[in-house]
Amino acid sequence: MSRRSTAEKETAKSDPIYRNRFINMLVNRILKHGKKSLAYRILYRAMKKIQQKTGKNPLSVSRQAIRGVTPDVTVKARRVGGSTYQVPIEIRSTQGKALAIRWLLGASRKRPGRNMAFKLSYELMDAARENGNAIRKKEETHRMAEAXRAFAHFR
């Protein structure tokens, strides 16, 4: 039996301007090659663009986008008797948010456009309006989970 105690989960710190942990999570996913100041600049420019385009609070728009993209279930590959099944599993809210952020950034990187701030702002606005590639990814995941519901007992 192990004498070691379980490590406590570190809480995400909040960003300096919006004082929001979700924004900091987004910045950490935008981050490339340790250039955090560049990641902050990209995100804050995207927020400014959202403010100009919608006239709404950019924080509420991004929260709405995350809420729209967060999946309830996902599929996990399980190997049973020589064949692999896609088994649907429910996911926790923190894991769902992490997936949603990853999908939003992936969709915005694939978007055609000038710069990352521009692409991210439009992807967040689209996700808040319930369309865009990130929303499509969530719906596709839910469809896969629904199709593989027969294998749910393999959990």
Swiss-Prot record:
One of its GO terms (biological process) is translation. SUPFAM superfamilies: Ribosomal protein S7 (SSF47973). InterPro entries: Ribosomal_uS7, Ribosomal_uS7_bac/org-type, Ribosomal_uS7_dom, Ribosomal_uS7_dom_sf. Keywords: Chloroplast, Plastid, Ribonucleoprotein, Ribosomal protein, RNA-binding, rRNA-binding. Transmembrane segments: none annotated. It is found in: Plastid, Chloroplast. Its main location: plastid. One of the primary rRNA binding proteins, it binds directly to 16S rRNA where it nucleates assembly of the head domain of the 30S subunit. Part of the 30S ribosomal subunit. This is Small ribosomal subunit protein uS7c. The gene is rps7.
